[in-house]
């Protein structure tokens, strides 16, 4: 039987690492796009890395970048994947205000470049685009596939172009191209500058006597937080459908940053009010007040439903960060 090949951009990130694990377990040969850096940035996938010289190796990493169309086209010719997952992005909302042009180049134009590389290579494959709930911006919750997009950051604007580029290639060229509109999804592998991980890392260090304060911005922002490990399964399920479409992936439950902090601190027997300090530097020029998704379409068509609620997730992340701090040399 011919082995299935998948190509993942952003394989070294939170979602990419979980997706790579998931696809390897399903018997895929997984190819990942990585950027060259002066230090290794593969910590999230080191545990599944395989020496390409070993027999039956099924994980391969390729240097490249979403801004290099020639390289992407050559990789499509060489690998001939049946599934392409575009997870790579400058995905930090606050940072996108500082580097808007770069965010647009990677998140918007980069997606278009990858789509065109697939088309130019003339390969038959299914394409998944990582959308984001940030595209809804100021639209009131609950947000679903028919809700209006009102982006409030350069990141969201760039992702919206990527969304419509995916729709355009689906309609113009008959490409099996799907958008997954994922609401906030977290895990112990979440980047350390994102608010949930920033909270759980601080809780672990405060609990173990490392630091004294946690500086945050808008505590009243409401988000729908789910478990990233579960969310990547929906990406694969979308590409198993005969017809490509767009799907919201969410838990349907919202909580404020304040509530997340409270639960995280209470998990180690502390009161968040004793440690959290508001720093106006972390307040964004345009705030998105509330994002809570309606994933009923995904449940009906894909059979996907979130299993882990945000409270369980917060505790899971605190526990993981405590173990990480304990394992570090003193």
Label for each model-derived stretch:
Residues 25, 32, 37-40, 60, ...:
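C-terminal substrate-binding subdomain of Rossmann-fold SDR/epimerase-dehydratase oxidoreductases
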Residues 1-185, 239, 308, 317-323, ...:
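N-terminal Rossmann-like NAD(P)+-binding domain of SDR-like oxidoreductases, especially those catalyzing
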